[in-house]
């Protein structure tokens, strides 16, 4: 039994559901890999907010609250998407699709985590961070999952806003306010989400089509999709450069180099489709994770070292 990309993988013969299997099912509902990526952006945001002098206990408390919020939102997303997860090969091994965890129990689990995240952040950080976390969960579940996901090909554009909120929560936990660097970090992730998700959707187009989810690759041509990927990749890189106004030389250098690499990959995908070649969009999906991680790790190091900045925030 193991977890992979939020899926419950059962390597043993079918049989009664044991305690360990059930426990792994609950863990899978929270989508640990997704949480990992979200939390990678929180620490750099907090370090930038106070140029590396943040209380370690505040960082830990914010991460715990963010983990609870993301786990709760992901679990509730799985509850709402249980019907379509059964129809997609990529998600057919998730706990609810396989009935490893009762749907009602998953709902209670998700709600409990969500409520716990609010009160944890309220008691250990501040009210603004708690409200931002609560609003993020509500937006992700009610607006993205229930309203947008099955109705529009632009679902991930607007729904992706939920994935941008960890930087806002991290910043507000330190400062008690929202300032323009936090908004720029929000935009970085907002613009990064469509090319990241659409590249995956290109690879699993048949899955989404079978489930009736109108992802852009399902309703548009590959050339149209890769053109949109290219546009959002450029916007992502430009946003990372805008953030360089409030960072040191280390972040700025990494943002330029990593951004160039990300743009080259997006242009190669677009050019390959335009020439009618067989392309591998999953490569862009995987490398986009690395890109975001590299940029935010550079931001964390730059901020921790308190390198001289172009502008003082």
From Swiss-Prot:
<feature type="transmembrane region" description="Helical">
    <location>
        <begin position="291"/>
        <end position="311"/>
    </location>
</feature>
<comment type="similarity">
    <text>Belongs to the UbiA prenyltransferase family. Protoheme IX farnesyltransferase subfamily.</text>
</comment>
<feature type="transmembrane region" description="Helical">
    <location>
        <begin position="34"/>
        <end position="54"/>
    </location>
</feature>
<feature type="transmembrane region" description="Helical">
    <location>
        <begin position="128"/>
        <end position="148"/>
    </location>
</feature>
<dbReference type="InterPro" id="IPR000537">
    <property type="entry name" value="UbiA_prenyltransferase"/>
</dbReference>
<keyword id="KW-1133">Transmembrane helix</keyword>
<keyword id="KW-0350">Heme biosynthesis</keyword>
<keyword id="KW-1003">Cell membrane</keyword>
<dbReference type="InterPro" id="IPR044878">
    <property type="entry name" value="UbiA_sf"/>
</dbReference>
<comment type="function">
    <text>Converts heme B (protoheme IX) to heme O by substitution of the vinyl group on carbon 2 of heme B porphyrin ring with a hydroxyethyl farnesyl side group.</text>
</comment>
<feature type="transmembrane region" description="Helical">
    <location>
        <begin position="152"/>
        <end position="172"/>
    </location>
</feature>
<feature type="transmembrane region" description="Helical">
    <location>
        <begin position="173"/>
        <end position="193"/>
    </location>
</feature>
<protein>
    <recommendedName>
        <fullName>Protoheme IX farnesyltransferase</fullName>
        <ecNumber>2.5.1.141</ecNumber>
    </recommendedName>
</protein>
<dbReference type="GO" id="GO:0005886">
    <property type="term" value="C:plasma membrane"/>
</dbReference>
<keyword id="KW-0808">Transferase</keyword>
<feature type="transmembrane region" description="Helical">
    <location>
        <begin position="237"/>
        <end position="257"/>
    </location>
</feature>
<dbReference type="GO" id="GO:0008495">
    <property type="term" value="F:protoheme IX farnesyltransferase activity"/>
</dbReference>
<keyword id="KW-0812">Transmembrane</keyword>
<comment type="pathway">
    <text>Porphyrin-containing compound metabolism; heme O biosynthesis; heme O from protoheme: step 1/1.</text>
</comment>
<feature type="transmembrane region" description="Helical">
    <location>
        <begin position="56"/>
        <end position="76"/>
    </location>
</feature>
<feature type="transmembrane region" description="Helical">
    <location>
        <begin position="105"/>
        <end position="125"/>
    </location>
</feature>
<dbReference type="Pfam" id="PF01040">
    <property type="entry name" value="UbiA"/>
</dbReference>
<keyword id="KW-0472">Membrane</keyword>
<dbReference type="InterPro" id="IPR006369">
    <property type="entry name" value="Protohaem_IX_farnesylTrfase"/>
</dbReference>
<dbReference type="GO" id="GO:0048034">
    <property type="term" value="P:heme O biosynthetic process"/>
</dbReference>
């Amino acid at each position: 039994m193991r977890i992979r990309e939020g899926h419950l993988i059962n390597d043993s013969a079918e049989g009664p559901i044991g305690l360990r299997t059930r426990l792994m099912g609950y863990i899978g509902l929270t989508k640990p890999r997704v949480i990992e990526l979200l939390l990678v952006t929180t620490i750099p945001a907090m370090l930038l907010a106070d140029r590396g002098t943040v209380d370690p206990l505040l960082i830990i408390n914010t991460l715990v609250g963010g983990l609870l919020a993301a786990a709760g939102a992901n679990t509730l997303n799985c509850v709402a998407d249980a019907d379509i997860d059964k129809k997609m090969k990529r998600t057919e091994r998730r706990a609810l699709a396989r009935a490893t965890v009762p749907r009602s129990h998953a709902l209670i689990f998700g709600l409990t985590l969500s409520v716990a995240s609010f009160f944890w952040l309220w008691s250990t950080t501040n009210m603004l961070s708690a409200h931002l976390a609560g609003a993020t969960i509500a937006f992700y579940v009610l607006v993205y999952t229930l309203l947008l996901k099955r109705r529009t090909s632009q679902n991930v554009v607007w729904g992706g806003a939920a994935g941008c909120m960890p930087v806002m929560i991290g910043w507000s936990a330190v400062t008690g306010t929202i300032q323009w660097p936090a908004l720029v970090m929000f935009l970085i992730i907002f613009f990064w989400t469509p090319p990241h998700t659409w590249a995956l959707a290109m690879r699993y187009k048949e899955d989404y089509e079978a489930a009736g989810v109108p992802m852009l690759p399902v309703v548009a041509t590959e050339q149209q999709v890769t053109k949109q990927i290219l546009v959002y990749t450029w916007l992502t890189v430009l946003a990372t450069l805008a953030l360089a106004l409030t960072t040191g030389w280390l972040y700025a250098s990494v943002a330029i180099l990593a951004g160039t690499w990300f743009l080259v990959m997006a242009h190669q995908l677009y050019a390959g489709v335009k020439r009618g070649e067989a392309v591998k969009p999953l490569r862009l999906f995987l490398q986009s994770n690395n890109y975001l991680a590299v940029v935010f790790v550079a931001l964390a190091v730059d901020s921790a070292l308190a390198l001289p900045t172009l502008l003082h925030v």
